[in-house]
Amino acid sequence: KSTKAEDVPVYFVDCGANAFSAEGKAYRKDYTDTLKNTVPDQAYSETSGWGFTNPASEVEANGSGDAYTTIRNFKAGNNQKTMTYKFALDAGTYEVVTGFYDPWAQWAGDDRHTKITVADEAGTELAVHEDHKISGSKDSVTLENITLSEAGNVTVNLSPLKKVDSNIDSCDVLVSFIVIVKKAAEQPDIPKTDTKAGLKAAIDLAKT
């Protein structure tokens, strides 16, 4: 392995999946020293340090296949709620990548929009993406420069932006995956084009 500092993924959460794919298993093998999650998705527990914090009665898993087509979503009737995942992180600077795909896009139309925020334990926003339309296209949003001066918990929060009473379930948020990448602390000798190697690997896997 290279002796140069590199970006490394610390969480690869395949939301809604009940097992890692073959690619996911290979990926876990490559980053066995840095990845903190040993299962694709779960409810939060203090012991493991990560997971969704919404009551299990509100959310469900859907889909099969790749990282995009497996999703965590709200059960019908649990409207206008924020979906939150919590993660324990060491001090450092991070990027958070959220992946999206709506299998019900033909019914949602333009109603499924989300605001994405990353916040610290005090609730202070560390990064925000104001408006992302979740559609039938597989895509992702990257939030950068998330810095923790000391170890602690962060939350990734997905909040609905639209309220259309006639199509209320289709206004609710859903998520395909969450990848958290720790940025290399010092990169004096690394060409700029290589600084996102770990992140690129994470996204490439998600698209397979």
Q: Which residues make up each language-model segment?
A:
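Beta-rich interaction/scaffold domains
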Residues: 1-6, 183-208
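Compositionally biased, intrinsically disordered or flexible polar/acidic segments
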Residues: 3-186
